[in-house]
UniProtKB/Swiss-Prot annotation:
Annotated motif GXSXG, positions: 306-310
Active-site residues, Swiss-Prot/TrEMBL: 308, 453
GO terms classed as biological process: cellular detoxification; lipid catabolic process; triglyceride mobilization
Function text: Probable lipid hydrolase.
PNPLA domain boundaries: 275-466
Stored PROSITE patterns: PNPLA
Keywords on record: Hydrolase, Lipid degradation, Lipid metabolism, Membrane, Transmembrane, Transmembrane helix
One Pfam entry name: Patatin
GO molecular function: triacylglycerol lipase activity
Subcellular location: Membrane
Similarity section: Belongs to the PLPL family.
Entry protein name: Patatin-like phospholipase domain-containing protein ACLA_029670
Length: 712
């Protein structure tokens, strides 16, 4: 190790090198206001008897009042009372048996993979993959493993059952031809879309194909058959779409208003990408490694949501710039994580007196450093351009959850939302959200009502993100320990293919995967039966079945691999050495997903750039995070981008006829295609069409509804 490397290693363990390490952002008066709000009496709802009678005053009521029912009407009945506990005992006993069988099945699959799959050279290449510390070296090792396993041949073949390769072939050919004609028109100097028919055709083509998961090109299965990348045809399609949009964006002849309407249409159809950080107590520190991997490769989404422990990480990311994050996401950050610094006797006595292990005001003081003091959601967005979202659940079980962000609660103080999202019953008592007034002082938010852990109901708020920000592509970093135990992808996941039978097999063989799926779905079924029959007890007034039966995955799900000692330290502060390991594991778990995320953001960032530069008024200034990302992408990936056409471009052969926006491609252009592809022969009979349809598979992770259970 050179002297420079030794110095760099010392710096990442030196707390004094952290930005604002000794800064105390929060003011004592703000903590006092928070403590006062916590100790205030519960807010009573103001209810009038009718429209004309006053409230909070004595009134003469009718003496004939109906007696209030003291029982839950849905739980009355002789059979319910007699059968509830025996049925509950039998079901729990059966779930226990299924749990033991599941553990034995997973042990069998583990031994099967170690003894049958990972042997010889492939095992050596896999070990080299697991020790890489940066994405460039990891990608080199992944490509070597793909070459050894024969995955490169799979990339070169267009046909695949999980996307429509025929449509993608035709669209790529049409885009290339339309881009060539549009460049010729733009270079001639004419202005206005009406005077540029080729540009108008190109815009129509883009509006037809720039959509979320168009023809299945964003199906995770396309990235689950190799360690690096996807089908060559899919990569060519993404590069060509980005090049065509860049042509429209750079054109001086197209009026800004027409550009804006075009990119607004694309933005609505394509949607946005969000990073979702799950809860999981101290397991949430694995998120730091995931964030660091995405940050180093310029693929960190602007929309970030966090729940419970993930909310603390999301708050740190949303309140710091990229440069500050690169200095903060190092092992020395462990010196600032002091939430569990109290001794055993202290927290036991507090739990006995208050019902919570940790002190809320002390946690507010510790958490405020990660949020840069009493920063609000609006202030964080204005400082970094990132959109922070935090899930909070009201202490009243009948009230809806809230996704706090700069739209729904712009003046809400971030650290109060983070505390509320982490207020697990028995760990931290429900918390009052705080809002910042115009004079800078703090006051209770939402009439002083209290909130608690968001992961109890909505660990991953996909629906709310789609409602507020048109998010339809989610990157989920999932570290909940009770969910990670049941994570198993029988056919591989993004960047982690099944090596058995060259990716065509099942983990542990078909029998092992079938048994695993059956047991997991059976446990899921019985938990749902108990919940729908209202047989589950509700300790602390909480329906705990939600921690199993909600949806915990996204379009891309990152699962950092935990170790047994993490369960022992689940409520303790990490040491620098343990945080260094969690950073490495988090980065390793994110590396296989980066190429998929890059392809998604390549199109999304170009759309956002078009909206920013062509929007009317004074909104044409690029956000710092977007402009910096676009500059880095242009510098690092210039060799991979499709260049402008100055001469005849070799086209792919297509039999696609003129329909809607598409036109026929000349056969002379197909002979010089630089990439081997599957012939686009027209199907000659109904039997051929039936054969093709029967070979198409639909990978639907939501087949059991929005509240999918234990992760699959």
């Amino acid at each position: 190790m050179t002297s420079a490397e030794k110095s760099a290693t010392r710096n990442i363990y030196d707390p004094s090198a952290l930005p604002d390490y000794d800064t105390q952002f929060i003011k004592p008066d703000e903590l006092h206001q928070f403590e006062k709000a916590l100790n205030a009496p519960a807010a009573a709802p103001l209810v009038a008897i009718n429209d004309w009678r006053p409230i909070n005053q004595r009134v003469r009521k009718n003496r004939r009042t109906k007696p209030r029912r003291s029982k839950d009407e849905t739980r009355e009945g002789v059979l319910y009372t007699v059968l509830k506990w025996p049925f509950l005992f039998i079901v729990f006993a059966w779930i226990t048996v299924l749990g033991i069988a599941y553990a034995l099945t997973r042990l069998y699959i583990f031994l099967y993979e170690q003894c049958v799959t990972w042997r010889g050279k492939r095992e050596r290449l896999r070990r080299e993959l697991s020790v890489q510390t940066n994405y460039r070296d990891w990608l080199t090792a992944a490509q070597a493993l793909d070459t050894h396993l024969g995955n490169q041949k799979w990339k070169e073949t267009d046909e695949y059952a999980y996307y429509d390769h025929l449509t993608i072939n035709k669209v790529v050919a049409q885009l290339k031809q339309a881009r060539k004609a549009a460049e010729s028109e733009v270079h001639n100097g004419r202005s206005g879309v009406s005077d540029l028919p080729a540009v108008e055709d190109l815009c129509a083509l883009l509006e037809a194909c720039v959509k979320n998961n168009f023809a299945g090109v964003e199906n995770p299965r396309l990235y689950s058959e190799s360690y690096s990348g996807t089908k060559d045809l899919v990569q060519e399609y993404i590069d060509e779409v980005q090049a065509c949009m860049q042509l429209i964006l750079d054109s001086k002849q197209i009026p800004a208003e027409e550009k804006y309407q075009h990119f607004k249409h694309l933005d609505t159809n394509f949607g946005r990408t969000a990073l979702c950080l799950s809860g999981g107590a101290t397991f949430a520190y694995y998120h730091f490694g995931v964030i660091r991997a995405l940050l180093d490769n310029d693929v960190l989404p602007e929309i970030i949501t966090g729940t419970s422990g993930g909310a603390l990480v999301a708050a740190l990311v949303a309140t710091r710039t990229d440069e500050e994050l690169k200095q903060l996401l190092v092992p020395a950050l462990a010196y600032r994580i002091r939430a569990c610094h109290e001794g055993f006797t202290t927290w036991v006595w507090r739990w006995w007196r208050t019902g919570a292990r940790f002190d809320t005001v002390d946690w507010a003081r510790q958490c405020s450093w990660f949020c840069r003091g009493s920063t609000t959601f609006r202030e964080a967005y204005e400082r970094t351009g990132r959109i922070l979202n935090v899930s909070c659940v009201p202490s009243d079980p009948h009230s809806p959850t809230i996704l706090a962000n700069y739209l729904t609660s712009p003046d809400c103080v971030i650290w109060s939302a983070v505390l509320a999202s982490a207020a697990v019953p028995g760990i931290l008592n429900p918390v009052v959200l705080m809002t910042k007034k115009r004079d800078g002082t703090l006051a209770p938010y939402s009439f002083g009502h209290k909130w608690k852990d968001g992961s109890l109901r909505t660990d991953i708020p996909i629906k709310a993100l789609n409602l507020h920000f048109n998010v339809n592509f989610t990157i989920v970093s999932q570290v909940n320990p009770h969910i990670n135990l049941f994570f198993f992808s029988s056919r591989g996941t993004v960047g982690r293919p099944v090596t058995h039978r060259k990716g065509r097999g099942w983990r542990g063989g078909f029998l092992g995967s079938a048994i695993e799926q059956y047991i997991k779905l059976d446990m899921n079924k019985w938990l749902r039966v108990l919940r729908h029959l209202e047989l589950l007890p509700r300790p602390l007034g909480q329906d705990w079945s939600e921690i199993w039966l909600q949806k915990f995955s996204g379009t891309i799900t990152i699962w950092p691999k935990s170790i047994p000692s993490d369960f022992y330290h689940i409520l303790s502060d990490p040491s620098p050495e343990r945080l260094a390991r969690m950073l490495h594991v988090g980065k390793q778990s994110a590396f296989p997903k980066i190429q998929f995320i890059k392809n998604r953001l390549k199109i999304e960032n170009t759309i956002m750039q078009g909206l920013q530069q062509s929007s009317p008024g004074g909104d044409r200034v690029l956000l710092p995070i977007l402009s910096r990302r676009l500059q880095n992408r242009a510098q690092e990936h210039a060799d991979a981008m499709v260049e402008r056409l100055d001469h005849s471009f070799p086209e792919r052969h297509s039999d696609y006829k003129d329909e809607s926006h598409y036109t026929e491609v000349s056969d002379s252009l197909s002979t010089n295609s630089s990439r081997p592809h599957t012939p686009d022969a027209r199907r000659g009979s109904i039997f051929e069409e039936m054969r093709r349809q029967s070979a198409v598979f639909f990978d639907d992770p939501d087949m059991y509804g929005d509240e999918d259970a234990i992760a699959t």
